[in-house]
Amino acid sequence: MELTGKHVVIVGGSSGIGLETAVLVRQAGADVTILARRADRLKQAAKIIGGEVRAEPLDMQDEAAVANWFSRFDAIDHLVVTASTALHGKFEEVPLDQVEALFKSKFLGPYRLVRAALPKMREGGSIVLFSGALSRRPSPNAAALSSINAAVEALTRALAKELAGRVRVNCISPGMTRTPAYDGIPEPTRSAMYENAARTLPVGRVAEPREIAEGVMLLLSNAFMTGSILDIDGGRSVS
């Protein structure tokens, strides 16, 4: 894939899927900008990516900061929003403020980023959002996450129609992936979680971040794809 001369902005690019995407995009010759909340992780990520990479802290829930950041650039070709969070618990027990926080992070955050980026995006560019396998195959104790993932997919399809002729809009729906997002879960609980998920999948394991990042590269490069929800879930959607 050739991305020489293209400016790719990756939100959540300091770790996991976002970092692996940044590595692949840089190898393809793109000018890379990674954004995330923690400056220390950004600094380390920039070393891993190598070459010329812009790494700047940004909280996508801060509307003024997001607007100010995008106002500083002349042009963006591709926007990838991998930053996300999760929430699990019984429907009747999960505090509503946590549900609201999840909605603000996983839906309103990307929504805000796309609105701010659009005036700077070159015609023919693309946007890649992230949902999750729970959007169409919900599990118990994940009502909020399942619903919000579905909302991201609906947003993807709506924007693909509304922004047709300007930019393409697609979405990755990944299955469980071995990323730092789960580092807060203590061992052996984390390993058990991966093992339990693996047993339900035809491929017999959870994903590695690079495998999801390769799907992002497909969406960036295939000019005939828009409004697509790309399942990279190890077969969860058919299991």
Please provide the spans of the model-predicted regions.
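Rossmann-fold cofactor-recognition segment
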Residues: 48-64
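Conserved Rossmann-fold SDR core element
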Residues: 153, 163-177, 225-232
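C-terminal substrate-recognition "lid" of short-chain dehydrogenase/reductases
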Residues: 205-232
